[in-house]
């Protein structure tokens, strides 16, 4: 029989690299606002740094690990690993650090689906090099993406934390959209340290002030943040919620979002995959928009926004709003405190909402439709926009 439609493209995918069908977008190596010739540690001490993959390279984070491995003032590195590349520079840097006398503690999740064998092999190599390997918590997957560096400077103990939305994987950092925050904020470092300590004791966080940490301190805190926006509306102010993740199935949070919509909170959701909330239903979700973006790169970053520009709380997270993530895994969401980074993430979210090329909107029938484009309206492909921005073509 003849080959038609999707079958044709699936067949082609086995014959050619998919890159053959795309124009070449050279991945940027140097990141704006980062000086590759200066110490990454000092630059992070000076100000928080946010990397946006694949539009910016993971090289800056790898350079941080390499610097830390050889810095005599560094005492320890702690990291959670879920999926890593076959030839991981990240793991090689951790091995290098251990061989240079640093205390290296690595939580390796052996239940990462399809990566079990790779993780076992890397675990053995790291153990042989002197790293302390922890294999997680019974019945609770560790899916968080966190790294904590402890060092001394001016006779004081200091820390650098890295918290991300995606894996420490150089290969997927070129294929998935993700965010990575590096900060010297000691309050955040204190809580990241507690997360590691709890994992080592096979326990979970019961209380946090800055981070959102599942399975005990995320779902309820997100519900509280939603309640905060409802309260604003009840006081005659503007309530707003903007969220981006891969899937939405958490019934508790779906019901909270419906309640917020009914009270008049404006809600924008960018959800690539499964969404168990139907937008635009009269008297229920009239104030909710749901958009899916499927482009050249896999949308993978998770962003939580609460409030308008004057009073806005922003988090980046490893967690989708699925019950498996919010109550059955260890996930970490980090607040963005740097005002410039808050503006940047807000702008990124706004550009995604404006995407009228790769974006599709859900209507009240639960189906997705192309946006109607008015004559003369600017065409926006959010992923292409972010690439051009990274190259300095867009200010």
Descriptions of predicted regions:
Residues 266-270:
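Hydrophobic alpha/beta core scaffold segments
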Residues 250:
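NTP/phosphate- and nucleic-acid-binding module
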Residues 1-241, 259-263, 275-395:
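N-terminal localization/anchoring segments of enzymes in phospholipid and broader phosphate metabolism
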């Amino acid at each position: 029989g003849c080959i038609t439609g999707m079958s044709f493209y699936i067949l082609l995918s086995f014959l050619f690299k998919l890159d053959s069908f795309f124009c070449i977008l050279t991945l940027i190596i140097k990141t704006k606002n980062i000086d590759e010739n200066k110490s990454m540690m000092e630059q992070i001490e000076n100000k928080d740094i946010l990397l946006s993959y694949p539009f910016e390279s993971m090289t800056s984070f790898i350079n941080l690990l390499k610097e830390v491995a050889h810095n005599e003032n560094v005492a320890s590195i702690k990291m959670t690993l879920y999926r890593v590349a076959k030839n991981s520079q990240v793991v090689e840097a951790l091995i290098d650090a251990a061989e240079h006398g640093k205390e290296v503690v690595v939580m390796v999740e052996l239940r990462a689906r399809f990566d079990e064998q790779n993780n076992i092999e890397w675990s053995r190599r790291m153990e042989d090099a002197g790293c302390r390997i922890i294999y997680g918590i019974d019945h609770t997957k560790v899916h968080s993406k966190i790294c904590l560096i402890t060092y001394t400077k001016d006779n004081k103990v200091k820390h650098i934390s890295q918290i991300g939305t995606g894996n420490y994987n150089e290969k997927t950092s070129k294929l998935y959209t993700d965010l990575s925050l590096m900060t010297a904020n000691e309050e955040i470092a204190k809580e990241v340290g507690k997360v590691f300590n709890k994992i080592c004791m096979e326990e979970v966080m019961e209380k946090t002030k800055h981070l959102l940490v599942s399975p005990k301190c995320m779902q309820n805190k997100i519900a509280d943040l939603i309640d905060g926006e409802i309260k604003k509306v009840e006081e005659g102010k503007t309530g707003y919620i903007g969220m981006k993740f891969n899937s939405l199935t958490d019934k508790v949070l779906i019901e909270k979002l419906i309640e917020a919509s009914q009270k008049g909170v404006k809600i924008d959701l960018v959800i690539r995959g499964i969404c168990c909330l139907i937008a635009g239903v009269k008297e229920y979700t009239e104030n909710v928009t749901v958009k899916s973006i499927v482009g050249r790169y896999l949308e993978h970053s998770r962003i939580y926004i609460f409030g308008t520009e004057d009073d806005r709380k922003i988090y980046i997270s490893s967690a989708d709003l699925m019950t498996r993530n919010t109550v059955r895994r260890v996930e970490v969401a980090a607040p963005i405190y740097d005002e410039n980074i808050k503006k940047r993430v807000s702008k990124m979210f706004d550009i995604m909402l404006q995407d009228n090329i790769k974006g599709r909107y859900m209507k009240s029938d639960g189906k997705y439709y192309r946006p109607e484009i008015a004559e003369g309206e600017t065409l926006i492909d959010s992923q292409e926009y972010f690439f051009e921005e990274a190259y300095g073509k867009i200010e």
